[in-house]
From Swiss-Prot:
Keywords: Endoplasmic reticulum, Isoprene biosynthesis, Magnesium, Membrane, Multifunctional enzyme, NADP, Transferase, Transmembrane, Transmembrane helix. InterPro entries: Isoprenoid_synthase_dom_sf (IPR008949), Squ/phyt_synthse (IPR002060), Squal_synth-like (IPR006449), Squalene/phytoene_synthase_CS (IPR019845), Trans_IPPS_euk-type (IPR044844), Trans_IPPS_HH (IPR033904). It comes from Nicotiana benthamiana. It comes from the Eukaryota. Its EC number is 2.5.1.21. It catalyses: 2 (2E,6E)-farnesyl diphosphate + NADPH + H(+) = squalene + 2 diphosphate + NADP(+); 2 (2E,6E)-farnesyl diphosphate + NADH + H(+) = squalene + 2 diphosphate + NAD(+). SUPFAM superfamilies: Terpenoid synthases. Belongs to the phytoene/squalene synthase family. GO terms for cellular component: endoplasmic reticulum membrane. GO terms for biological process: farnesyl diphosphate metabolic process; isoprenoid biosynthetic process. Pfam families: SQS_PSY (PF00494). It is found in: Endoplasmic reticulum membrane. This is Squalene synthase. NCBIfam families: squal_synth.
Length: 411
């Protein structure tokens, strides 16, 4: 009923949702039959359905390299995230992880659910890795080595300052941006982007995730994970976990807004990076997550629900982003729309209001100066006509029947 209610409220979401559903089914049908690659792509669908969809934009050879790159780093991240592993065991694994990708026999039991399966059967990933061309292998090994060393450093060190925060985000996400740029260049489809721009692409995504995932991280057992920098949260509370208490709601929202404001300066670099991409498939692969990130920040800003549960874009809006993000004009339009939405939520009494508005105005000016805003459809301002709820219900039922028949024919 929740999905139907959302569609009745936002009927323009229906068509993109159906397209997304069909695309997801098509992607699942594309899983290779070989045991190793079949495991890798099926695992990709389990650990990140959204990434599994986005990766389908890429040409096959590059797609395979990016798939393995993602799974290797996801495995590394699983080791880092498992708070039950003693530090004296975890640190050496993180530091040497780049060597294990060459070992067809290596595996390490940790994580839960699908992540445990990934770690227990890591030999499928390492075997597929060894089938990649050498320059792809070298790029993946280099980034894995640097990321593992950075993660090991922060196992023994808390995120105290905003510089620490940027450094941690560089290790766990900025390096992903550098690695992807290397893979794109190795495929001979793109020029090699600068490290600073590639780093910003990763930092913007990672900071968005850290903001959104506050409650999940702080409630982690047996030990909480704390990525918000003390330099920011200590202005509002004595302990980071105090932000989730109702008595601290006003301070929590102010701290949240401070964190969102900290993420905004990366946007200009991201727009510069994306505007230089030539290959349409690589462009979509890079652009869709960035648009999702600015949309998520707009949802999170000034929203106490970040400290109560999960805040994310509605599925219909996500589907719309995936469907409409095709050109740089679409990207500038999306960043303009979501920045306007965020700007409308800024309370002048917020201690960081002036800084937030200044940073948003820089983004809005960049989007205006692109000269492309008249070429896009708004993500937020509804330009489509409102449809009769009865008509929407009828269409929804018909589409459900069609999808059920398609599913039956495939089985």
């Amino acid at each position: 009923m929740g999905s139907l209610r959302a569609i009745l409220k936002n009927p323009e979401d229906l068509y993109p949702l159906v397209k997304l559903k069909l695309a997801a089914r098509h992607a699942e049908k594309q899983i290779p039959p070989s045991p190793n690659w079949g495991f890798c792509y099926s695992m990709l669908h389990k650990v990140s359905r959204s990434f599994a969809l986005v990766i389908q934009q890429l040409p096959v050879e590059l797609r395979d390299a990016v798939c393995i790159f993602y799974l290797v780093l996801r495995a590394l991240d699983t080791v880092e995230d498992d708070t039950s592993i003693p530090t004296d065991v975890k640190v050496p694994i993180l530091i040497s992880f780049h060597q294990h990708v060459y070992d067809r026999e290596w595996h390490f039991s940790c994580g839960t659910k699908e992540y445990k399966v990934l770690m227990d059967q890591f030999h499928h990933v390492s075997t597929a890795f060894l089938e990649l061309r050498k320059h792809y292998q070298q790029a993946i090994e280099d980034i894995t080595m640097r990321m593992g060393a950075g993660m090991a450093k922060f196992i023994c060190k808390e995120v105290e300052t905003t510089d620490d925060y940027d450094e941690y985000c560089h290790y766990v996400a900025g390096l992903v941006g550098l690695g992807l740029s290397k893979l794109f260049h190795a495929s001979e489809k793109e020029d090699l982007a600068s490290d600073s721009l590639s780093n910003s692409m990763g930092l913007f995504l990672q900071k968005t995730n850290i903001i959104r995932d506050y409650l999940e991280d702080i409630n982690e057992v047996p030990k909480c994970r704390m990525f918000w920098p003390r330099e920011i949260w200590s202005k509002y509370v004595n302990k980071l976990e105090e932000l989730k208490y109702e008595d601290n709601s006003a301070k929590a929202v102010q701290c949240l807004n401070d964190m969102v404001t900290n993420a905004l300066p990366h946007v200009e670099d991201c727009l510069t990076y994306m505007s230089a991409l030539r290959d349409p498939s690589i462009f979509r692969f890079c652009a869709i997550p960035q648009v999702m990130a600015i949309g998520t920040l707009a949802m999170c800003y000034d929203n106490i629900e970040v400290f109560r549960g999960v805040v994310k874009m509605r599925r219909g809006l996500t589907a719309k982003v995936i469907d409409r993000t095709r050109t740089i004009a679409d990207v500038y339009g999306a960043f303009f729309d979501f920045s306007c939405m965020l700007k409308s939520k800024v309370n002048n009494n917020d201690p960081n209001a002036t800084k937030t508005l200044k940073r948003l105005e820089v983004i809005l000016k960049t989007c205006r100066d692109s000269g492309t805003l008249n070429k896009r459809k708004s993500y937020i301002i509804r330009s489509e006509p409102n449809y009769s709820p009865v008509l929407i219900v009828v269409i929804f039922i018909i589409l459900a029947i069609i999808l059920a028949q398609l599913s039956g024919n495939r089985s």
